[in-house]
């Protein structure tokens, strides 16, 4: 749209969970590498990469709380010119368990952990309610402004 090229970096873990590869959840280093490689291969090919699984989540999900992994993730994240949006959960929408390894309460706990992580690391983000038309237009305008288009 309007001369902006984009692609989607799909959530790698979701594919693995559909394959019943549950053990992979325990290795955030592996998952980070897979997700980061997708971004790396796309970054020079398109203007915009859209993802529902930013690499920051690997630090949020890292049960070992490894400071070296966190530093690496933040370093890689900061190599990109990011716009980060947190989409608030709509209580009227049923939570889909398929392709996820936590239930709704677990997902809400991750939401809170993510917000704390972003705050602790002074990472800018915007919160939006849903991904409907108005919010899509807002995001698109912000992308255009960032790209000077």
Label the model's feature ranges:
Residues 1-38:
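Conserved substrate/cofactor phosphate-moiety recognition/catalytic segment
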Residues 16-19, 65, 140:
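Anionic, Ser/Thr-rich low-complexity intrinsically disordered regions
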Residues 30-79, 94:
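Glycine-rich phosphate-binding loop used to anchor ATP phosphates in small-molecule kinases
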Residues 32, 36, 136-140, 144:
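Short, amphipathic alpha-helical "lid/cap" segments that border enzyme active or binding sites
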Residues 124-126, 140-149:
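C-terminal accessory "lid"/substrate-recognition subdomains
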């Amino acid at each position: 749209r309007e001369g902006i090229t984009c692609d989607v970096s799909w959530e790698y873990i979701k594919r693995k969970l559909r394959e019943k590869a549950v053990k992979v959840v325990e290795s955030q280093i592996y998952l980070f590498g897979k997700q980061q490689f997708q971004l790396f291969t796309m970054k020079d090919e398109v203007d915009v990469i859209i993802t529902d699984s930013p690499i920051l989540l690997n630090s949020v999900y890292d049960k070992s709380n490894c400071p070296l992994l966190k530093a690496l993730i933040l370093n890689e994240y900061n190599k990109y010119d990011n716009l980060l949006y947190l989409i608030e959960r709509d209580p009227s929408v049923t939570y889909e368990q398929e392709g996820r390894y936590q239930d709704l309460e677990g997902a809400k706990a991750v939401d809170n952990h993510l917000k704390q992580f972003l705050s602790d690391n002074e990472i800018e983000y915007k919160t939006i309610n849903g991904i409907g038309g108005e919010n899509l237009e807002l995001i698109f305008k912000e992308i255009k402004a960032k790209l000077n288009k």
